[in-house]
């Protein structure tokens, strides 16, 4: 007689979840950060706000961003003037854009990941889709299933409105799905488009202006599975453990609210301080089982919320400058793409590690950490084990 325990054992994978492939995509429209303040104040009819424009220029200069990619072109904004105003009712116009474009950009990234994985897409058993750009029913997960031609029986999970920590969340979920379902191959997609947050400047809402200086569009996709097929699947990283926590005394530090005017963004000044003050506790809890306490012995992937967060984390933990190289590179080339950022950094790291002839995907090191930071303040901590390049 077969018992429930027998069935349970048979359902479980043997090895840890691994990242088997990564793909990324951006809209074609590239925006130069050095000329963006002029463009932004012109397109939003705000050129008379000279003092505010100077303030915005300083924000852009300090952002450490060289360029960003944006679905919103000048043509689209001219056709939708309400999106350019500060706090004008515009949710319908924004929704009409993102419900189409978010799955489309996700498809581009997913197609690249599936190609690298090298297996037929019919072998994808689960889909996790994550976006903070718009909400719809059926969701972007359903739309992507149709766009990619996945099996109708693919098991879908749609994550809306999680914000910047969610790149860590999707890895945590994919790990659990892969390890508890033998043979599972999980397609994870994060797709973000700033059409929900773009708006004109205001003297009274400077945190909104911070978002206008930092946010960019991008999608990233990964394939996660346990027990890779030898000679067929080439794992890049193992997902060793994953944790989530809400930081103490951080209520209201980062908020986003979906309103008639789109997604509004609110930020307290001390977000970098709150994160840097608490990050060592998360690291200690994650790496204590491995007996690791030298944070410079790890490879690092941290959500680049902004340069101040990275600077303070570096300072607090005494990290060498090169530790956040991959993170800073992605911030500089793409801006803050919310949930997609950490997956872009994972991709950048494994590619540069191979190009530099290093022995592992994690800059030649064995163990690494991936951090997601976002509304809550919520922190996701993922322990990674690199594999040979």
From Swiss-Prot:
CDD domains, A to Z: CHS_like
Active site location: 164
Catalytic activity of the protein: (E)-4-coumaroyl-CoA + 3 malonyl-CoA + 3 H(+) = 2',4,4',6'-tetrahydroxychalcone + 3 CO2 + 4 CoA
TM spans (from-to): none
GO process terms (BP): flavonoid biosynthetic process; polyketide biosynthetic process
Membership in a protein family: Belongs to the thiolase-like superfamily. Chalcone/stilbene synthases family.
Protein name: Chalcone synthase 1
